[in-house]
């Protein structure tokens, strides 16, 4: 077997339509386009979303919401995720290294979901009231 002898398996690719080759082919004369009308002509297709002059769906419905540009730079981390980082001091750099927050994140907030694995010191990261209580109850501390 050589690379130049390899071909597609039989039936894996549909055969090319040969139009205009007689009545018996079912693609003769009008070539499967029917009689007259816009879709029978060359270049006779309308743009996507065109509804024949009726107000298109995209324009009938109101605009809703927006995507905040700030979302890229703010992240949330749970107490359970913090325990994966390990003990010691936890800051923005440590969370980025552990892959818990995106590298472009500028602000991080720890939320009280789950439980703290051990004693940790949180430095330079926002903390909710519940998360602060859980960290301090586990013997850790929160530094601003």
From Swiss-Prot:
GO terms for cellular component: cytosolic large ribosomal subunit. SUPFAM superfamilies: Ribosomal proteins L15p and L18e. InterPro entries: Ribosomal_uL15, Ribosomal_uL15/eL18, Ribosomal_uL15/eL18_sf, Ribosomal_uL15_bac-type, Ribosomal_uL15_CS. It holds the Pfam family Ribosomal_L27A. GO terms for biological process: translation. Residues 1-25 are annotated as: Disordered. The keyword tRNA-binding does not apply. It comes from the Bacteria. Keywords: Ribonucleoprotein, Ribosomal protein, RNA-binding, rRNA-binding. Belongs to the universal ribosomal protein uL15 family. Binds to the 23S rRNA. HAMAP family: Ribosomal_uL15 (MF_01341). This is Large ribosomal subunit protein uL15. It comes from Methylococcus capsulatus (strain ATCC 33009 / NCIMB 11132 / Bath).
């Amino acid at each position: 077997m050589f690379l130049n002898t390899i071909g597609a398996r039989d039936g894996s690719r549909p055969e090319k339509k040969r139009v205009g080759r007689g009545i018996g082919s079912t693609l003769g004369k009008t070539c499967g386009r029917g009689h007259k009308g816009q879709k029978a002509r060359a270049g006779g297709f309308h743009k996507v979303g065109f509804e024949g002059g009726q107000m298109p769906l995209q324009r009938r419905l109101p605009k809703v919401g927006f995507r905040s540009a700030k979302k890229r730079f703010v992240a949330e981390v749970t107490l359970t995720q913090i325990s994966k980082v390990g003990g010691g001091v936890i800051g923005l750099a440590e969370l980025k290294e552990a892959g818990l927050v995106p590298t472009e994140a500028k602000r991080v907030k720890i939320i009280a979901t789950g439980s703290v694995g051990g004693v940790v010191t949180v430095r330079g990261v926002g903390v909710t009231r519940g998360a602060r209580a859980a960290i301090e109850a586990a013997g850790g501390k929160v530094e601003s």
